[in-house]
Amino acid sequence: MARYRHSRSRSRSRYRRRRRRRSRYRSRRRRYRGSRRRRSRRRGRRRGYSRRRYSRRRRRRY
């Protein structure tokens, strides 16, 4: 998993150089969302359910 993540970040940096203004904001948002999903999966058993519901509401607003 770590290897896959690393390669992905590398390709993203290349893409960022091409289109700086727009891609920067977009990539940042995507990263935040992804990290949140991963966290919920790890902790998920204790209070993951309530968190999932909350994230769903937020996603709709996005």
UniProtKB/Swiss-Prot annotation:
Keyword terms, alphabetized: Chromosome, Developmental protein, Differentiation, DNA condensation, DNA-binding, Nucleosome core, Nucleus, Spermatogenesis
Cellular compartments annotated: Nucleus; Chromosome
GO terms of molecular function: DNA binding
Region of interest called Disordered, as start-end residue ranges on this chain: 1-62
A Gene Ontology biological process term: chromosome condensation
Expression (tissue specificity): Testis.
PROSITE patterns: PROTAMINE_P1 (PS00048)
Domain of life: Eukaryota
InterPro entries from the UniProt entry: Protamine_P1
Example of a GO cellular component annotation carried by this entry: nucleosome
Role noted for this protein: Protamines substitute for histones in the chromatin of sperm during the haploid phase of spermatogenesis. They compact sperm DNA into a highly condensed, stable and inactive complex.
Family: Belongs to the protamine P1 family.
The name this protein goes by in its record: Sperm protamine P1
Organism: Bettongia penicillata (Brush-tailed bettong)
Gene from which the chain derives: PRM1
